[in-house]
């Protein structure tokens, strides 16, 4: 009997913010990192392609628009390449955690220029779709879900929004989120446990006709 993996609903919703790039093993990542350190531009590009979606998913809730999130992602990778010579792999530590720490810091620098995170919520008021054979129905649902996710996240305190975004948008483990944010791992776990059901309930509420 085939067992299908159950996708966490928050992971599925965050996936709407950016499409995944190629999947790399950690060994492959380390080979690319070492090659990029030596100036191999194709290795640097492979790292970018593999991780840009996760960076975008992690920083989009921290930014006021998709354009700002894209700028933050680009600046993140400029910093990654500039500081790559300082990166030292440690057993059990993942390269993506280092990248997303830089992304989080970059997003917070950008946010210092404005203290409110407005979210375009027009898409939340789209007309109800017909359940007929409209080929755009699924796309419309995705637009509404994406907008609902961003609205729900924007209502969280900055600390909790950052933790949730790194955890489910960036795919980091609790200890990696703790290292990226300077919070204790137990506090990160408590934030995730508390906010996850709240977010899902709020998103469901926003999607009600």
Task: Write out the residue ranges for each language-model feature.
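Conserved catalytic/ATP-binding subdomain
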Residues: 67, 93-97, 143, 147
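Structural recognition of an alpha-helix C-terminal capping motif at a helix-to-coil junction
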Residues: 71-78, 82, 93-105, 190
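Hydrophobic recognition helices of helix-based DNA-binding modules
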Residues: 55, 59, 80, 84, ...
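Sigma70-family region 2
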Residues: 37-38, 61-65, 77-92, 113-115
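Conserved RNAP core-binding helix
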Residues: 28-30, 45-48, 56, 66-83
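Arg/Lys-rich amphipathic alpha helix in sigma70-family domain 2
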Residues: 82-90, 100-121, 142
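Intrinsic, short, N-terminal disordered tails of RNA polymerase sigma-factor systems
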Residues: 1-38, 42, 46-49, 111-115, ...
């Amino acid at each position: 009997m085939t067992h299908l993996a159950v996708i966490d609903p928050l992971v599925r919703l965050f996936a709407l913010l950016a499409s995944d790039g190629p999947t790399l093993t950690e060994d492959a990542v380390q080979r690319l990192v070492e090659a990029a350190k030596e100036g191999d531009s194709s290795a640097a590009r492979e790292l970018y392609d593999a991780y840009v979606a996760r960076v975008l998913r992690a920083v989009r809730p921290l930014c006021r628009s998709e354009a700002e999130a894209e700028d933050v992602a680009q600046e993140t990778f400029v910093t990654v390449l500039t500081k790559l010579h300082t990166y030292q792999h440690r057993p059990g530590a993942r390269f993506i955690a280092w990248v997303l720490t830089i992304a989080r810091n970059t997003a917070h620098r950008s946010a210092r220029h404005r203290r409110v995170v407005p979210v375009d919520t027009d898409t939340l008021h789209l007309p109800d779709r017909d359940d007929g054979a409209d080929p755009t129905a699924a796309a419309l649902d995705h637009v509404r879900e994406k907008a609902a996710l961003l609205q729900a996240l924007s209502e969280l305190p900055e600390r909790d929004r950052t933790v949730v975004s790194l955890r489910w948008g960036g795919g980091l483990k609790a200890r990696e989120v703790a290292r990226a944010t300077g919070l204790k791992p137990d506090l990160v776990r408590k934030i995730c446990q508390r906010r996850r059901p709240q977010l899902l309930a709020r998103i469901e509420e926003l999607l009600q006709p």
